[in-house]
Amino acid sequence: MLKVCVIGGGPSGLMAAYTASLVGHQVELFEKNKQLGKKLQLTGHGRCNVTNSCSKDEFFKHIVHNEKFLYSPFSQFSNLDMIQFLKSNGLPTIEEDHGRMFPGSNSSQDVVLLFVELLRKNNVILHMDEACTDLMVEDDKVVGIKTDKGLYSFDVVIVATGGKSFVSTGSSGDGYKWANTLDIKVSDLYPGLVSLRTKENFDLAGLSLQNVGIQVKKDKKVLYKQLGDILFTHEGFSGPGILAMSSYVIHKEPDKIIFDLIPDKSIDEVDAFLLERMNRSSNKQLNHILEMMIPKRLVQYIMDRLNIDDSLKANETTKVQRRSISELLKCLDFEVSSFAGFDQAMITVGGIKTNQIQPQTMESKKIKGLKFVGEVLDLDAQTGANYIKFKYYL
């Protein structure tokens, strides 16, 4: 029997503590907050999007960085195993769009309470409101930890401190600091799954668009191209499509984002379609015809941007004006100012480099008995659901 310490009471820490206790180890979990699973309770707007029902192949498509590192952990405990784990412990899940899985109770609190019950049943000692301040290492082996309340000796220390996102939940990047001190390599860190700010100002906050083409460029080079849902904000753009994109390109500092509002048609097809509508309703105002294609608020923005008068009728519209509208519908571009910071980020992009860790055991290749799990590692995914999923089973 080993004395095992888990630092961090988030998803990966809770699962690590439970898994270690299952095989008879003496486990103690340290959490700097007064409650466990603080960040976990924010997922799915408080409903807790615990995992996803997608296939193995689909799962790995959504991993942005270092997906091969996850092959071994995934083979030991998959998303389907997670669903069965919850069900067997009295918390069945329900499936919603895009395979998102939620607890049947629709309460993130129930997920946290389940883990608390399991940990206490297995005699895991919980140190709440106690912050770990340093790791104790001797002769390249971890021997314990220092906290703001004392010193503790352990055979194994599992660091599950999370990243730097959602600072209000206690994530302050401690794991990275300790790794750097021990010469365990950490990649550059960036906020992930964040909104984008533009240089242009527009009065479209709250407007959402579904299944539009999203293209991001830097110096005219395409960095990212995908379909997704977007939301106009007071500062720029958010929504699932923007959040997913951000993790791919934030470190490349893009300068332009372009939206294709009608991705299933070419510019010529859009132009022909618009001409047909205008011929059919030649006495109608042009903006009313456009409102049959895109939201009214966006029509007003496009008309203003092209300096086209609101009162212009279809039969008064020139070929050049019509073509300009078609081109803007296919290429609505904005200059990128910046992305939101860690205070608004859902995840951290980057972390402890995976080549420093044994994927079968999550143990450091440099320090015996020291393991890193969850968001502290250089692993991130496109969506919150997939992200929570691999945080659990690492």
Task: Please identify what each model-predicted range represents.
Residues R47-E95:
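Glycine-rich active-site loop/strand segments that organize a redox cofactor
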Residues K34-L36, Q41-L42, V50, K56-D57, ...:
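An anion/pyrophosphate-binding glycine-rich loop and adjacent beta-alpha core
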Residues C5, S21-H45:
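Glycine-rich FAD pyrophosphate-binding loop
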Residues M128-K141:
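A conserved short coil-to-beta-strand element within the FAD-binding core of flavoproteins
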Residues M128-D129, Q300-D380:
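A glycine-rich dinucleotide-binding beta-alpha-beta segment and adjacent secondary-structure elements
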Residues C5-I7, F30, C132, Y152-S168, ...:
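Short hydrophobic core segments
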Residues M1-S12:
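Beta1/beta-strand and adjacent pyrophosphate-binding region of the FAD-binding site
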Residues S165-W178, L182, L379-L394:
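A conserved FAD-binding loop/helix module that cradles the flavin
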